[in-house]
Regions:
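Short Pro/Gly-enriched beta-strand edge/turn motifs at strand-loop
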Residues: 105-108, 200-215, 298-306, 346
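Beta-strand segments within the central parallel beta-sheet cores of soluble alpha/beta enzyme folds
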Residues: 91, 260-266, 293-303, 330-336, ...
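Flexible, low-hydrophobicity surface segments
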Residues: 11, 20-180
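Helix-loop-helix junctions that connect adjacent transmembrane helices in secondary transporters/permeases
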Residues: 171-254
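Gly/Pro-rich active-site capping loops and adjacent beta-alpha segments
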Residues: 30, 143-163, 244-246, 304-380
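Alpha-helical support elements that line or immediately flank enzyme active sites
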Residues: 61-92, 134-154, 225-292, 349-359
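Glycine-rich and small/hydrophobic secondary-structure elements
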Residues: 108-143, 272-325
Length: 380
């Protein structure tokens, strides 16, 4: 068992390492104790929820109950009567619509390299079951939950599509105007001459479809953040993997200078890529402003993380290999279809990166590879 005495003894031993010129320590070949290890082992580490003041308002999100359509009206009358409810905000309360991207990518001044800005903090144009259409701010969790159940929503429903191959067909429901056949992006790799290579006599054809399912990351700590007005800035504390990008995106979402946003990232209880996307920080900050800058906490329940945060994309791949009897590859072909869900998020980067590795898997002089990232009415 690692005791406090042993912990500090290890640190002292590390300090005895010989120093290079200029006073720099030599760590190569030495035992180095993680600076965060002891606090985590004894349970002293503080996570996002531990740091939030008890006087915070609680926010809960109302998600859509249809896969594709438009919100016609939202009746909040009964919800607002519930004791403890501070405010009910809907997609119709957005005075200005600032679309923003969510991917954990660096920002580019070249518009062609920028991530797709297709999200709003709350939307009246629903694209998947679980889209964010309203939010409740209350003094406690019980009041917030009761208010959610009291809200009445009227929709105009549209046809939906859940399969990537169906989504690419002519006449399929279109999720976004600027992406015909719901194709977010299509990229190709060409090496050698596939069509000529497969004419070689005696080749063995190996062909099949291979699919990976969508996977939820299931980190122990659900997504959580809280926001409050701090002088002329908005302070947001979030269990994110990308604090600097969250700062920029929150500025874009609120239509304010990035310098007026302060992000604090405590220890996080797992992320595994789910928190490498901007999730509900912009919404939490916007809700904070709706109640005069008062502290607002948004803790997403486990059930909602499966539907309304992020998943690893399902990818369906068709692979054809032409092989000589001695086992050497002559030509290989791949078509990969990534089910992006309703919004761009990290966009084509996931599928493109996977397909980019295809020519490197086996020695082969003739390769064709196509990557398609496709919108469907499903979770992102």
């Amino acid at each position: 068992m690692l005791t406090e005495k042993m912990f500090f003894k290890n640190i002292a031993e590390c300090g005895k390492n010989k120093r290079r010129k200029g006073g720099r320590k030599m760590y190569v070949g030495k035992k180095v104790t993680r600076v965060d290890a002891y606090d985590k082992v004894i349970g002293r580490t503080r996570y996002t929820d531990d740091l939030c003041d008890k006087g915070a308002y609680v926010a809960r999100i109302l998600h859509s109950t249809i896969a594709n359509g438009k919100v016609v009206s939202i009746d909040t009358t009964e919800a607002e009567k519930i004791p403890g409810v501070v405010k009910v905000c809907t997609c119709f309360d957005l005075k200005e619509k600032h679309y923003f991207p969510t991917a954990g990518h660096p920002w580019s001044t070249d518009e062609s390299h920028q991530d797709v800005a297709d999200r709003l903090v709350l939307t009246d144009r629903v694209r998947f079951y679980g889209d964010d259409i309203a939010a409740v701010i209350a003094e406690d969790e019980v009041s917030a939950a009761q208010a959610l159940r009291a809200i009445k929503v009227e929709y105009e429903e549209y046809p939906f599509v859940l399969d990537v191959h169906e989504a690419m067909k002519d006449g399929a429901p279109q999720l976004h105007e600027n992406y015909p056949n719901n194709i977010l992006k299509h990229t190709t790799i060409r090496k050698g001459n596939y069509e000529e290579a497969i004419k070689e006599p005696g080749l063995i054809k190996v062909e099949g479809w291979y699919s990976t399912p969508p996977v939820q990351h299931c980190h122990i700590e659900n997504f959580i953040c809280y926001a409050e007005k701090e002088a002329e800035r908005i302070k947001i504390v979030s269990s994110t993997q990308i604090p600097h990008i969250v700062r920029r995106v929150c500025g874009q979402a609120l239509g304010i200078d990035w310098g007026k946003i302060r992000i604090i990232k405590p220890y996080i209880g797992g992320g595994f890529g789910n928190k490498q996307d901007v999730l509900y920080e912009p919404l939490c900050a916007w809700l904070c402003l709706q109640v005069g800058g008062h502290l607002v906490k948004l803790d997403v329940p486990r059930e909602e993380t499966f539907v309304s945060t992020r998943v690893r994309h399902a990818i369906h791949s068709h692979i054809v290999s032409w092989v000589r009897p001695d086992g050497t590859f002559v030509a290989r072909k791949l078509e990969a279809f990534s089910d992006q869900g309703a919004y761009a998020s990290h966009g084509h980067s996931i599928c493109a990166k996977g397909v980019g590795a295809f020519p490197q898997l086996y020695p082969c002089e003739n390769v064709e590879a196509d990557a398609y990232t496709v919108f469907t009415n499903k979770s992102v």
